[in-house]
Structure formats: structure tokens, C-alpha cells
Amino acid sequence: MASLIYRQLLTNSFTVDLSDEIETIGSEKNQNVTINPGPFAQIGYAPVDWGPGETNDSTTVEPVLDGPYKPTSFNPPTDYWMLLSPSSPGAVVEGTNNTDRWLATILIEPNVASTTRTYTIFGSKEAITVENTSQNKWKFIDLAKTSLTGSYSQYGILLSKPKLYAIMKRSGYLYTYSGETPDAITDYYTTTNYDSVNMTAYCDFYIIPWAQEALCTQYINNGLPPIQNTRNVVARPLSSRSIVVRRAQANEDVVISKASLWKEMQYNRDITIRFKFANAIIKSGGLGYKWSEISFKPANYQYTYTRDGEEVTAHTTCSVNGVNNFDFFGGALPTDFVISRYEVIKENSFVYVDYWDDSQAFRNMMYVRSLAADLNSVMCTGGVYEFSLPVGQWPAMTGGAVSLRAAGVTLSTQFTDFVSLNSLRFRFRLSVEEPSFSITRTRVSGLYGLPAANPNNGREYYEVAGRFSLISLVPSNDDHQTPIMNSVTVRQDLERQLSELRDEFNALSQEIAMSQLIDLALLPLDMFSMFSGIKATFDAVKSMATSVMKKFKKSGLASSVSTLTDSLSDAASSMSRSGSIRSISSNSSVWTDVSSTLYDLPSYMSTVSTQTATISKRLRLKEITAQTEGMNFDDISAAVLKTKIDRSAQITPNTLPDIVTEASEKFIPNRSYRILNNNEAFETSTDGRFFAYRVDTFEEIPFDVQKFADLVTDLPVISAIIDFKTLKNLNDNYGITREQAFNLIRSDPRVLREFINQDNPIIRNRIEQLIMQCRL
């Protein structure tokens, strides 16, 4: 069988371990070397943390806590909190849109019995009944009315020990705080023309950007920092916030120290970062109703901007980490809409932006210290992506938003097709924002995060402004530079070749003849026959096989087998490192443990679909350890791989290891496996579908998960090349004998070839779907 190639790679991987061990032993030899530390070493001094000192800048980076400001009337900008700090009871703040919302906040001191007090609100005296039964907390009360002549009602009570209150205009709402400190939370009021609401503050106040809402909540619950509670902090007029502070030479190069050959330079720079997201949307084979993957991909962007009168050419690479995998399963029919996997970035994700420009600061970045940066935040909102179905209304993924906040900066290396560039990697934390995203014409709605379907929302780029500073050790002669800047990127060149090769491989799927594929799948392919299509000498093929084994031992399949072997306590402890995978299949107790492990799933896996999907993902490991007479998915996978290798015009010894490894992991991701027990068949798939049925009548029976898990121990696992839905469709339309049914259930290649030679459309369509799943 063609899948022999995968078992051979797994069996012989221990020889690669031995080769690597020999190399490791050779590299661990010690050698004493005398080093002259030079004038820049801190010999004899305690470790110190050098900071960059004062950094001049001309780019505005919003302060976290701006103020305090004196009481005043003004129209505060949207998306900014007004943090109010009253010193005495009475009216705190009032605001109105002059149409349907008049809102005021008053403050009552502790220990006040029910009484009526007179407050001046919006120029009129109002008698309000108030009380505060708390012994040590001040009480904020919102007074609201919807007409000019109406009466006030009390809402949104906040009991506060720090005596702080906040209000903000955002997205059609007026946001405030309610509850009791230290557990106060945000609340809101709906209003029209919210952006025109004027506020009158009767106490000192601060301004905090909405991006720092978590810090504002911390102040509300725990009080201001100690430095804000001293007599040295004096409130100033709000007009001072508009004063433009001009600083000379924001972008400068400062010589910190200098010797004959080297000098330390401090580079202070304003920076404009533009980046965009890239994605990959892959459609599954079949009738056109299913998508296999919607994922984020790294995106390069090159642009120019003016910095301090100088035109700068910059290059950024945007990538994401910690994505969340979602899926949508509309049904098992070929015309049901399905998305096998789509990625979403949320608050547990990170966005990385690698930045490089052609300025002097990036010419020499081999030895850098005291790296610091300040960046503003940016909002990223998702757009609309329509899934073009052959028939019917198109579903659309729409919405989603996240805000990016700078979380740090490190050195990195940016790769282009020909060179590697030392650059700065800016790391951004995420928080989910409104609106949520949904898939129209489905039940998927109200989910938060930014999906990969249309992350740029029609924008050419997102932009972040800020500044950075670093100290770099550079040659004293400005004409010299360290050689790393223009070093050739071998791996990046290989990635480019692999990308082109993947596209070619995927395009070749439609050119494979099914009858020849079945014949090839039955051949016992080994490493040399698999790679014989590549023009190379015998020595080159031998070296290439070693390279493939080195890469393959790090594949997901090899790792799964290794993890499984280690987890089988008694069996694993008796195996030596040189044991092959065949020793696993010969030990009956191994799969007894596996079946027990499979059934002892965590409590949250309560559905049969989840349990069977989890079991199905491990059945491949058992099937690959024991060769059966029937054909399996790995036979088809290896045959497709061999066919594409022979037909490819771009395959090389350098790209072959990556291609073979990817094929073992990614070819035919949606697989079904069955256990045959007398006249009953149990069938499960990796996407959670499960069936139990009688072989002679194809009548469905209840699926017993416990029985299925027990049968895994004693009975062989069979690849459901022709799955239950296809079998039932074949029987309903053409009628098949009991013997043919048993042979198709056993994945007998002889019967499969007969149906293909008869040009049976149902069987041909099923095999075509499997071939189309052989994608990289």
C-alpha cells in the first residue's frame, strides 16, 4: 500500500535522532577563550538599568491622566472620560442635548437621614429628597428628566469611598459608573445627538482616553495615585489643554560615548506605523457550499512619509498570534453551508508589527540597549465578506472590532525575498469592541472579536503614531556598517519557493486520473520510489531521504505517535528508543489503555458529537500502525503526493522535506473511520458526525459511544473511503448487493476500481472530493 511511505518515515526516524545526538555531542565540547572586554564593558560594576533619559518628540502621545482642570462648561470630545473629583456635597456635573435628555449628578455625604435639599440644576432651584445610610461612603445620584418642564427621577446610584465619579460620551450613549466601590462598574443612558451634549463641571476634573478605561475604573474604585492628592497639584484652566508646546529637534542623533573604532549613538525618532492584515480564504471541493479555512496571514506593506522635513521609506510586516478557531456547521448535506475553520483575534491574541525604515537609526542595529517606545492606540473594524453560493441567498460575515494598545517593543528581523533587515517589533494587546460580528442568514450572531474574513474593511492600511528611542553601538566611521543589514535570506527564499510550489500542487488536483490513482495507491511505495521522479543522482536521493526524515520527525503525525507512546505507561516503559512503530501495534494492552483514555474525557465534553470527533482524530494513529487489506486515506494521500511530485516542475531537494511533511498533516483533513462488528458498523468523522447502522439494510441504529470505544481495542480501524452518506445514496439510486456493501465498507480497492471503471457518478464524486482535499 502507498501509505507504507509514512510508516517507513515514522519507523526510521530514530536514525535521525542518533545522527542529531552525534552532532550535539560534537557541539558541546568546551574551549577556553580569553576575551578583551574593551572600553564599553562594565567590568567590576554592579548591574545597572540604563534608561534613555529625556526623549524629545513632536508626536502627541495621549497622557493617561490629563489634569486636573478647573470647573468649567464645555462640549467634551467623544470617547474621553471626565473623571470628576468633588471636595464637598452638592451638584457635581450636569449635561443636556436640549431636546430629550437632561442629566445631572449630585453628591451626598455619609450618614444623612431622609431629607429634602435644594439644588441649583440648569439654572433652576430643584427640591430633591435624598438620603445616605452608609457610614463611610459618599453617595452619587444621577438625576434625569426627558423634557424641560418635567420632574427629575433618581437613577444610577454610586456609593464611593474615594469620592470620584466619571462620565463619557460614546456611540450614542452617555456612560457613567454605578454600584459600590471597590466593585463599581460602568452604566449608560441612551440619548440622541449625544455628540452635542454640553457638560458643566462644578468641581475639578481629569480627562482620560477611552482606551484607558480599565485605569479609569481602577481610579473610581481605589482612588487617584498619591501624587494627585498633594497640595502641589494645582488645577489649571481647560484652555491650557490647547496650548501647543514646541520642542526643538524632536528627531535627533546624540553621541553618548566614543572610542577610536566604536561609538554609542542615541537615536530619538518620531514614527508613523502603517500596517494591514492579510488573509487566506480557501474553499473546499465539492458543490461549492463549503469553505475549509479563513485565516490570517502575515502582510508586508511599504510606504513613505515625512519626518521632520525628511522623506522616509518604511516597511512593515503585520502578523498575529494567539488566534481563536471558530467553525460553522450548517448540516451534513452536500448543499449545506459549512465553514470548517475561521480565525478570530480577541483579547487573548496579540498583533505584531515589525517596522524598518531607511533612516540612520536602522543602519546599525547589531548591539542595542535602552530601547523604549510610546504609541497611540488604534481601532480595527471588520468589513463584509459574502460567501458566494451556487444557489440561494449568500451568507455574509460582517462586523467585529478590536482595539490595539501598545504592549512593548523588541528587536526583530524582517525578511524580504532577498535580504533580512534588522527592525523593531511592536507588540499590541487587544480588547474587543463594538460592533460584534455575525454570519447573516445563520444563527451565528453577537460574537466579539475581529474575524479574518475582511479585517481591513476596505482600508488600505491602519495607522499608529508615536515615538521610539534606542542606544546603538555603531562604527565610529559613519561610512561603515555592520553586515547583517544586507545578509541574504536563505530561508525566506525557500519560503517563496514553497509558496509557489503549494499553488502548483493545489492546481494539479484536477489533472489526476482516478483509475491510475487507485492503482498507484495499491503500490508499496517506499522512500526511493516516492522520490524517483526528482532528477538527481543516487547519492542526492539518499541525502534527500535523510532530509525528509529529519523534517518528518517534527511533523504533527510523528509528534502524535510519540506523545501516544509516552502516555501508555506499561508499554512505553518497556520500549527502548530504537523500538519502531511496529512494536506498538503488536502490544494488545496498548489500545486497551487508549480506549479507556478516549472514554474518560473531561466533563465539559458532554455531547456525543464532541466525544466521537475526539476519538476519530486518534483513530488514524491506530490505523497507520496495522496494515489491513482495505485501502485507507493515507494510501490516497501518498498516491496523490507521488502523482504531484512526478508532475511538478518546481519540486527540488530543498523543498521536498517541507512538502512531504505538510502532505502528511494537511492532506484529506475531513476523514471518517468505521469499526465493523458483525452486521453492525460504527462510523465517526473528525468533524463530529457519527452513524451506527446495519450493513445489510443501511438502517440506522442508536450510536453507543461506550461500545464504540471498547471496540477500538479489539477490532481493526477502517478508513471510510466511501462514507455512510455516499453508501446510502448509492444504494437508494443504483442498488447494491450485500457483498458489494461489505466490500465498500471494508474499502476494498478492487470493488472501488470496478465502480470507477463503470463511471459511477456517486463513487467518482466521492473520490474527487477526497482528491480536492489534498491541498497544502
UniProtKB/Swiss-Prot annotation:
This is Outer capsid protein VP4. It comes from Rotavirus A (isolate RVA/Mouse/Brazil/EHP/1981/G16P[20]). One of its GO terms (biological process) is permeabilization of host organelle membrane involved in viral entry into host cell. Residues 389-409 are annotated as: Hydrophobic. A motif (DGE motif) lies at residues 308-310. One of its GO terms (cellular component) is host cytoskeleton. The lineage of its organism: Viruses, Riboviria, Orthornavirae, Duplornaviricota, Resentoviricetes. A motif (KID motif) lies at residues 644-646. Disulfide bonds join 203-216, 318-380. A motif (YGL motif) lies at residues 448-450. Belongs to the rotavirus VP4 family.
